[in-house]
Every structure is written in C-alpha cells, then in structure tokens.
Amino acid sequence: MRGLLLAGALGLPLAVLAHPTHHAHGLQRRTVDLNSFRLHQAAKYINATESSSDVSSSFSPFTEQSYVETATQLVKNILPDATFRVVKDHYIGSNGVAHVNFRQTAHGLDIDNADFNVNVGKNGKIFSYGHSFYTGKIPDANPLTKRDYTDPVAALRGTNEALQLSITLDQVSTEATEDKESFNFKGVSGTVSDPKAQLVYLVKEDGSLALTWKVETDIDSNWLLTYIDANTGKDVHGVVDYVAEADYQVYAWGINDPTEGPRTVISDPWDSSASAFTWISDGENNYTTTRGNNGIAQSNPTGGSQYLKNYRPDSPDLKFQYPYSLNATPPESYIDASITQLFYTANTYHDLLYTLGFNEEAGNFQYDNNGKGGAGNDYVILNAQDGSGTNNANFATPPDGQPGRMRMYIWTESQPYRDGSFEAGIVIHEYTHGLSNRLTGGPANSRCLNALESGGMGEGWGDFMATAIRLKAGDTHSTDYTMGEWAANKKGGIRAYPFSTSLETNPLTYTSLNELDEVHAIGAVWANVLYELLWNLIDKHGKNDGPKPEFKDGVPTDGKYLAMKLVIDGMALQPCNPNCVQARDAILDADKALTDGANKCEIWKAFAKRGLGEGAEYHASRRVGSDKVPSDAC
C-alpha cells in the first residue's frame, strides 16, 4: 500500500524523490512495498438517468429523516438480500444534494470495503449512487459463535512482522471497546498512539470474502489500516495508508513562491463566514501564537509526533512579522517566517474551501464546529521544517474527528536549501489530500482513495487546485504551469510535463495510464484533464482574479471558481475508490445539480480532448480511450 511518496506526498516524476532521509523517536520506516497491498477497485457509479431503481418521495419539507429513508429504500431495492448499516456522516451539501453512506454487514460485522453512497437531489428523488457491496454468498457460520479465529494480539504481531513495522510488543495487552470485537492495545512502543484492532470482513481481490482483523497502527511516517487474515494471523489481504504524503508578513494568496512577488503585511486575513472564531481562537481560548480553530503550526526539527509543546512564534501584539531572505541559511534562522507562512496558507485555503462547500458537515478540519454538525477536535497539525525527511511533504487524513497532519520539509536541491512552506502550491496540494479523502465516501471513511487509479486522482486534485489558485490576471487558455519548480530548483517542475491545453506541450491522455503504475504519474494525467476543464469554463464565464468567489444563486459567477466548485462537489458524489470515468461522470452530475447542466458541453469537450469522452472505459488491466463528445452535449 501507500508509502510516503505513494500517498499524500508530493513526489518527483521519475523517483527523483525517494524517501525522507531520517526518522526520530524510534519510529522506523518499513521496507515492505505497501503499494502491493492496495485494495482493489470495484465500485459502480450510476446517475438518475441510468437508474431503473429511482425512488420517489412525497415528503415535504426536505428533512434528514426523509432523505435518509429515501436513500435506505434505494439500497433495499437494489440489493434486497443485503444487510447494512447507515454510517453516521450524512449531510446536505452546499449544492442542495444530500449525501448518505452505508456499510454492508454480515453476522453483525462490517464488510469493511463494501460501501454504498446515495445522493438525494433537492426534489427528494435519487440523484445518483455508487456502491461496492458484496453480492456473493455470505458464510453460513457466524464466526462470533464458533470463535475459532486468532486473537487480536496475534493479529498485531502478524501485522508487525508482515509489514516490518518495528513495533515493540513485549508488554502488549488488550482493552475491549464498546464496539463489537474491537480492542485497543496497551504496552506498545514504536507507535504514535495505541494501536487498535477490530474484527471485520473484507472482500478480497478474487471476489471472495475473508474474515480479518483490521489493525490500525500510526507509526508517524505511515498511518496504516492492515487487514490480516483472522484465521492464519499472517496473511495480509489489504492495507490502507491515511498518509498521502492579526498581521502576517507573508507571500500573499495567489503568489505561489518567492519568484512571483514580494512578502507583504496582511491584517486580519480571515473570512469570518468561514472562520467564525478567527484564525487565532478556537472558541474557548484566544491565542497569540500560530494556533487556532483551523490549525496549529509549529517547528518540528526532530520529526517527532508530539507537537503541542513544540516551538511556535508568540506575538502578544499579534504582529507576526519576521525576517526572511532567499539567501538566508541555515533554515532554522528563519523558522518564525516559515511557521507564519504555513499557518497563513493553510488557513486561507481552509476559508476558501469552506465557501466552496467543504464545511463542518462535509468533514472539514476544525477544533470546534460551533454546533454546525460534523465531528470537531480535528484541526490540522502543521509542521514546518519537519525533520522526518527532505525534498517532500505529506498529509495524513484520518476520519472526521481526528486531526489531519501535514509535514513540510526542507528541500536540498539548491544552495542555500529551500523551505517547502514558502511554495503555496505544495501546501495546497497536501491540504487537498484532506479535502478529497474526507469528501470521497463520506467524512467517516478515509480509505476511499486507496486503489491505484483513485489514489492517482488524489494526487491530481492536489495539483489542480494548486494550479487553479495561482492563475494570474493575464493568463489565457495557452498559459502553461509547472508544479514544485521553485522548491525543487528544477526547471520544468516535478511532473513529467507542464499542465497545458496544448497536446504538443503535454501529450498525456487517459490511455497514458496503461503505461503508468505510480500515483503521482497518474495524478499528472488527471490534473491536466481538469486543467482543460478549468480553461473551458473560464473561456465561457470569465475569470475572477480575487481571493474568493462571488456567487449568484449558489453558483460561482466565474469559470475558475466554478471549476473548483464542480470538482469539489464531484468528490462528494462519486463512489468509494472511483476510477477516472466515474469521477468524470460525478463532475457532470455536479454540474447538473448546481447549474442544471448548463456547462455540459464545455465539460464533455475537456474530457473528450484527453481521452475520457463518451465510450471511454476503465478495466483493471487496461483503459480504453475515446475522444467522442455525446451528440446531445453541445
């Protein structure tokens, strides 16, 4: 499964960035290739026009009980013999579409990769749905009756050995939780927090059902869910990694890196509609440091997991103004400026995403959700100059209610070294892993971008959002952009091609994925598809060069923010572990929900140009491309 560069990390196209160079506090990097343990891609995605199982409702008004009942009835209609439970993360998106998630069960245990997401339209009817429910035979024997499976300690030992995690288990013991066959481990060293284990079923790649222990281990560089066979205690059937790799003197929003403009002093930069407590309060306490409701930023030179007592600048008069020079060395000499920049960029992005629909109910990152739904206690831990690696960055996204964790590294490809916190595109790329992981499959499920193609799209969304945000006033359809060029000191950036609407400059299409088996390379293809979409919508609606969108009837009035909004809404519509064809359909459906399909032509043309037109197909062994625009699209 996902190592640092294979999930949530910003990597170079040809393995220029291998792995961070060192670790701290005894947390060892495993040597096993987690990529080989990815869960397989098996979801279906169907919109209302394709569905023969549309469920009408006569309820009024649109209430939580009614849309959950509508969604539940659809699942019963589609798979009448399945047993399942409602996941408690349903909500109504800013586009008026309600999202409800279900988990299949067998003998009272979760089938952990059998998910069903239902999207209910504003009219109370099914808008679209996706699922990966198991349709084979459920074992007759209830494992909880016979109880001949291995114990959780054996499962943890088996996980430790199979993945070479270097966890010390000499004093290990278990403590039962309130959930069925669920345990916390005590007396363990080598992990950030106590490991956990829960007995669940898993649909294997061959389509059969296996009883497994789901073992959760946060070893800092990787935050793993390992599905280990409950009968043998040794065979690993799958692994999920949550890590995808006042006055502020900063590079202002829209300046991607120091080559694009000077630092300026910005006063009270927060959007009060998105950050009700400002950036330096959490609703309970007011701070004079880089800490607040949305994030807590600090230095982390040792690369450790502790952060509350780490150094952060303190300004009683709230003047976060610190010196920084491109020639300054060593990096710790400008740590105050680095922390301030990271805090500013992450908070600004939080506020922008909030206005585009990534709010409390959708699973955003906030300590206090102010009574607006979702699970709180999950601001983003922002580590500047993190000592656990170099030439990279990463973001860990656990489910809603647990803090996200971003690590920004020093880049050593230049003299003097460069600090990744000063390249906004890297910060935005990493934070977008949190966005896409929380929205896809619902806030309570952070393992829905784990398959190779969906994981690649996770990287692509990060590149796309970073690029859309850095557009300049004079840019046109023919403007090209690179990724990570400043930090890596690499002309042309860290992807194989610039993002471009020219097939000569960037020849990548959907069938290029047939030759790719690494998520960053796959992501570069997806990001360029979205770059085509971005410019088609800008050409139609114009471009707002301001720091936040303007809306009319809930729809961004310009093409740039409209593209970002449709991409975000599509994440919430698509199934768990989607492929590119399904993600395309979800974006089309997002436009249908938001604008009644007013941009269908522009969207189809963008996808068709890059091989994702009508008739494009995903298969596990190959992709089939198409440049066809549907006859009714334009």
UniProtKB/Swiss-Prot annotation:
It is an enzyme of class 3 (hydrolase). InterPro entries: FTP_domain, Fungal_virulence_M36, Peptidase_M36, Peptidase_M4/M1_CTD_sf. The keyword Zinc applies. Its main location: secreted. Its EC number is 3.4.24.-. One of its GO terms (biological process) is proteolysis. Zn(2+) binds at H429, H433. CDD domains: M36. Residues 289-310 are annotated as: Disordered. Binds 1 zinc ion per subunit. One of its GO terms (molecular function) is zinc ion binding. Residues 19-245 form a propeptide. Residues 289-308 have a biased composition (Polar residues). Keywords: Glycoprotein, Hydrolase, Metal-binding, Metalloprotease, Protease, Secreted, Signal, Zinc, Zymogen. It is found in: Secreted. The active site is at E430. Induction: Expression is controlled by the prtT transcription factor. Belongs to the peptidase M36 family. This is Extracellular metalloproteinase NpI. It comes from Aspergillus oryzae (strain ATCC 42149 / RIB 40).
